[in-house]
């Protein structure tokens, strides 16, 4: 039988992103050969904060599976959007952002990027770190 490229990705593999948060690896270039899209699970314990960053030329869609989280976004992270369970957020390419779980409960994101690798072309904006301290 010919290989049609369909792949099943099972849970269990974790990795730390350049954003400083731990992901549960999902479909990506590495796990399934996906070139144009990837999806990962991002559990964030209370108080967890991603480091400010943007994805050069890559769009992001994130679905809040459990809990709620504040996403700081904009050139100087001047805007805040609280995303609650069942809601989704779209972050255009090249927009600096940083999700921060300011609640007292764990939140769990399902994150999709328009690239086969969510860390590819991820640009850390270290000059914005002080804003989240």
Which stretches of residues belong to each language-model region?
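Conserved hydrophobic/aromatic beta-strand scaffold that supports enzyme active sites
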Residues: 39-43, 61, 80, 88-90
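Short, charged/polar surface micro-motifs in flexible loops or helix N-caps
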Residues: 32-35, 44-49, 66-70, 115-119
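Conserved short histidine dyad/triad with adjacent acidic residue
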Residues: 40-56
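Short beta-strand His + acidic residue motifs that chelate non-heme Fe in jelly-roll/DSBH
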Residues: 51-53, 71-72, 80, 91, ...
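Ligand-binding loop in jelly-roll beta-barrel domains
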Residues: 84-85, 93-119
């Amino acid at each position: 039988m010919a290989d049609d490229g369909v792949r099943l990705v099972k849970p269990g593999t974790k990795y730390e992103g350049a954003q400083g948060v731990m992901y549960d690896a999902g479909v990506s270039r590495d796990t399934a050969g996906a070139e144009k899209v990837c999806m990962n699970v991002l559990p964030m314990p209370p108080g967890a904060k991603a480091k400010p960053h943007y994805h050069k030329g890559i769009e992001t869609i994130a679905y809040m599976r459990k809990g709620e989280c504040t996403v700081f976004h904009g050139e100087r992270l001047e805007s805040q959007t609280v995303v609650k369970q069942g809601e989704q957020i779209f972050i255009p390419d090249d927009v600096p952002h940083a999700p921060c779980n300011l609640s007292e409960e764990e939140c769990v994101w399902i994150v999709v990027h328009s690239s086969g690798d969510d860390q590819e072309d991820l640009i850390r904006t270290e000059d914005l770190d002080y804003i989240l301290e």
